[in-house]
């Protein structure tokens, strides 16, 4: 029991809902970049509607290999439970929303993304700026899995990372697991889009896990 209480004490949850940020400005506490510096770096601004504030990536640069990222400055972790609400707004090339973790720099990180144009959810490693989809545990390399990702509506994407095992969830349903050990060091977490995706994000929730978690 003492060990369990210690573990719970070592786990912390925080939710970034952007309610204290200024509309029309980038959110505080984030850094912005783009993989391999291909295309425009992205325009991440806080927006507001009747339901409250949210973060939007608003730059519609259609460069296909363009991957804008927004990462939290003050959180570095190895094992995380990471989720976000997202809403694809527009994009002729892509309508993508992603979560990144163990982010070392703009060219090296893990990524899971949902795409409303492809209707699938795929987990990748980005290593040296090269994006590679990873095989699903027990299924092989299938390019993720099909999922109905609605455009213009809010959905929830989640990944649970424990050591070299990653569990992927979409709208509360578990989709698959992936095992990979490319990045084992702690890194930052954040958000990701692709090409001309204009995407809204809200309620970025991060639970950091105790190092001794089984």
Residue ranges and their predicted role:
Residues 1-6:
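Sec-dependent signal peptide recognition
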Residues 11-35, 213-214:
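Extracellular carbohydrate-recognition regions
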Residues 15-17, 183-214:
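Ligand-recognition surfaces built from glycine- and aromatic
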Residues 23, 57-131:
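Secretory/extracellular carbohydrate-interaction modules
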Residues 25-57, 62-66:
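Extracellular glycan-recognition surfaces and repeat-rich motifs
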Residues 129-156:
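Short, aromatic/His-centered strand-loop micro-motif at the edge of beta-sheets
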Residues 153-167:
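Localized edge beta-strand/strand-to-loop motifs within extracellular or lumenal beta-rich domains
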Residues 169-190:
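Short, solvent-exposed beta-strand-to-loop segments that form ligand-recognition rims
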């Amino acid at each position: 029991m003492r060990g369990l209480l210690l573990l719970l004490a070592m786990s912390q949850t925080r939710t970034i809902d952007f309610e204290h940020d200024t509309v029309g400005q980038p959110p505080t506490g984030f850094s912005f970049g783009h993989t391999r510096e291909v295309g425009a770096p992205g325009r991440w601004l806080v927006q507001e509607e009747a339901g409250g504030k949210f973060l939007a990536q608003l730059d519609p640069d259609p460069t296909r290999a363009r991957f804008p990222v927004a990462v939290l400055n003050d959180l570095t972790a190895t094992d995380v439970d990471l989720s976000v609400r997202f809403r694809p707004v527009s994009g002729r090339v892509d309508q993508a929303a992603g979560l990144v973790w163990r982010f070392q720099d703009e060219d090296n990180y893990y990524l899971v993304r949902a795409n409303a144009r492809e209707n699938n959810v795929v987990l990748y490693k980005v290593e040296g700026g090269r994006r590679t989809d990873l095989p699903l545990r027990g299924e092989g390399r299938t390019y993720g899995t099909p999922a109905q990702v609605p455009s213009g509506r809010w959905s929830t994407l989640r990944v649970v990372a424990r050591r070299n095992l990653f569990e992927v969830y979409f709208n509360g349903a578990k989709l698959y697991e992936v095992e990979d050990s490319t990045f084992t060091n702690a890194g930052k977490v954040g958000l990701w889009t692709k090409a001309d995706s204009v995407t809204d994000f809200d309620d970025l929730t991060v639970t950091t896990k105790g190092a001794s978690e089984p």
